[in-house]
């Protein structure tokens, strides 16, 4: 490579990097926690205790934004689902990250503060996961609540039913999903999707990069829920023929969605400020200028806060870059985050509503029309299901309350593992302590019909390793 | 609806029962037989152990309940809704057809039957239109071809045989030519199968006494018969004579309505089990026991068959159409197409096969098995030929589906082996352990018969236990064979190994057991 060329590139990288950083800083100040305060709803109370009137509860009042309060008021029964969803998100997040340095810890919730702590102020991978999983959980639990009938305002959309099931199954019998539309109330995912957009995306206007990142990750979470909505069909008929075919949709267990999102977390795409930041045109191509302007690798070694970034090796270990594998389904069109893209069925009335509400609706849809460019121009642009982040994650090794990092002191680790949960990585090389403890646990359980489990209490010795 | 048809064995099984031997040897042989169900029990117990482990964390039962609830919510409602949308118009059309026929027949003099046939034809046509849409034209074309073939009957008995061969052959040809190209053939196949059965039966019936007795039915009668609303969409087969008998409804509407209701309820129940409950259970036991997975998957297949059968029963009841043959008519449900209770808890494989699809069984017995086996005292070779012939015809009727061929041949061999062995055992032990239920206290020829013995006698319990073991074995075979038929019969042929996966997992156990049965039989006799 030509030296002068490299020089120019570095110069440009510095310029744009600097400017992007300053912008990130700026919006952290202005947009801090804007759309994320609602997470606190998880701690408001037990889902069971919530009655429809409780949207007036002061705790909820302080947690939700005005528009969110209105949504909750207008959709009786939704509050319980939201609380459930938020708790679902937290427990799933903590499950997925149980073996990592950052273990999705939540803080004691107090009003005006963010549930997941200050880590959310940074646009790092972990933040992207938080946004995606919370949005996904809300979609999931609302859809589930819909099908359970606990939300009064989500009616079954009978416009989706085929005129007669018979008319479909012939064509669908082999071609599969092609032109089959589900019937009944099983398409509540549409309501969940719509509601999640209205509710979760409230504070995110998409005006700056961080808000775009949040929007993108929220959308990605919803897209994962939608993708896990499986159609199942069964043929009935004489001699294995397909005279009667019945189909239904099934929403997968949230654990599956959590697993998928975690995989996307591992292969998340780092995005950067582009020249077309304010372009609302969905079809704006990746500008060659912007793409070429920054050739710094995505492992972020050149970022100024070097004290906090991972070492190269650890970074690889922790983040397992594999955008190429995970982007296999991002065909060219899916670069555009058209809201209806993942499944045209899900938002049947988008067109109608758009027509009815005119301009307002149009503006709202534009919110999702943007293109994020990968930090490393050699990577593919993020697809609709990919998570995106802006800056490298801190190492999470040392306690840093200013940044909301608890550190890994006192965490348990696995001595034999070579992965992130192994003591070497988990304790950041500080060393670890070996303790023998006597654990009392239930054992030799027997099942008595029906339905009782009787167990003995056993004392076993266990060795645990704790980071210093 | 119908993977059965070897029931015919039953006919000759009871014909010759001689050969008395001593009881000594049989004790050992019984042990062997008991050994098999035990191996199956191992599966069972294995499964229960696993279940306990699942339960250990205290969530097993809850989890199962949760999953069931979940699948119920997402699956039952749409399934039932779609089934209702499917069945309701058909039922209404059947009732309409019945009403029209009733009104017409109440005229003073019945000048012509043609309007009755026309009502049937029109209603059937509307049902088919609702079911298959424009593909109806293809069916009508095939019906026209069938009518042309029917003219062969002018040749007499020989013509009927040619007709049968041509019909079955052409069905196979359609499969070969159309199936590959058309994605919708699987839907038409079942309908066309019933039409073919009706054609063949018509041919044999008309030429029964060697000469052409009656005129070949006119086009209206033919079309009315072929596309009668009660039987056109879902079957079952009814003979032309039976159709003519029921042109004018006899039962009162009240009786029909009373029978319709339980049919509809059971229909919904069956589709729920087939779509939702069985797959959920199969999922739940997915990691613990392969036998349970097979069992639940096969239950899904079986209840799918019950579902179609009961739906067809509802249509029969609605249009007051009766079935041929031994009057298997229950007071509650009307004509019976299958007897789920005999399938879920079978006495033997052959009795199971006979209860699977009664009209189809009747058809095969009447038109294929009986002609192939002219006299009762025929040689064993002749009988075997008749069985093979029956197998071949029913396979061909079912169309090109490798899975069905495999299942049918396995069923035939298993049923044959079991019947032979049990007959031998019965005569050896002088106990009522044959494949067929003993006819009762007076007529049972064996001395050790549960109906003759008191509860506290040892032989009573031994006979009971033996039959129970055979039942358990049949249940295992049923799960083993049924699981293959799960899923669409569409992608067969491309990946032959995928549907044999379960058999591989089970180590082809059923087939070895079947083989063992034959060996044991030869050993004893």
UniProtKB/Swiss-Prot annotation, chain A:
Source organism phylogeny: Eukaryota, Metazoa, Ecdysozoa, Arthropoda, Hexapoda
Region (Disordered): 333-362
Membrane topology: Lipid-anchor
Phenotype on disruption: Accumulation in the Golgi, thereby preventing secretion.
Any one cellular-component term (Gene Ontology): terminal bouton
Bridged cysteine pairs (disulfide): 93-104, 146-154, 156-185, 233-247, 235-242, 397-428, 413-423, 427-467, 443-458, 445-455, 450-451
Similarity comment: family membership: Belongs to the Wnt family.
Signal peptide: 1-17
Result after altering residue 104 to S: In allele wg-IL114; temperature sensitive lethal
Tissue specificity comment: Segmented expression in embryos. In embryonic tracheal cells, expression is in stripes flanking the tracheal placode.
Keyword Iron annotated: no
Location in the cell: Secreted; Synapse; Membrane; Secreted, Extracellular space, Extracellular matrix
Binds porcupine: region residues: 83-106
Glycan-bearing residues: 103, 108, 414
Protein name: Protein wingless
Annotated GO MF terms: cytokine activity; extracellular matrix binding; frizzled binding; glycosaminoglycan binding; heparan sulfate proteoglycan binding; morphogen activity; receptor ligand activity
Modifications the protein undergoes after translation, according to the UniProt entry: Palmitoleoylated by porcupine. The lipid group functions as a sorting signal, targeting the ligand to polarized vesicles that transport wg to unique sites at the cell surface. Depalmitoleoylated by notum, leading to inhibit Wnt signaling pathway. Major form is glycosylated at 2 sites, glycosylation is stimulated by porcupine at the ER.
InterPro entries: Wnt, Wnt_C, Wnt_CS
Self-association state and partner proteins as the record states: Monomer; folds by intramolecular disulfide bonds. Interacts with porcupine (por). Interacts with wls; in the Golgi. Interacts with en. Interacts with the proteoglycan Cow (heparan sulfate-bound form); this stabilizes wg and promotes its extracellular distribution. Interacts with peg; the interaction facilitates short-range diffusion of wg.
Family matches, as Gene3D superfamilies: 3.30.2460.20
Entry keywords, A to Z: Developmental protein, Disulfide bond, Extracellular matrix, Glycoprotein, Lipoprotein, Membrane, Morphogen, Secreted, Segmentation polarity protein, Signal, Synapse, Wnt signaling pathway
Function field: Binds as a ligand to a family of frizzled seven-transmembrane receptors and acts through a cascade of genes on the nucleus. Segment polarity protein. May be a growth factor. Acts on neighboring cells to regulate at least one gene, the homeobox segmentation gene engrailed. Wg signal represses arm phosphorylation. Wg signaling operates by inactivating the sgg repression of engrailed autoactivation. Wg and Wnt2 have a role in the developing trachea and together are responsible for all dorsal trunk formation. Wg also acts in the developing epidermis.
Record organism: Drosophila melanogaster (Fruit fly)
Keyword Nucleotide-binding: no
Result of altering residue 416 to A: Glycosylation disrupted
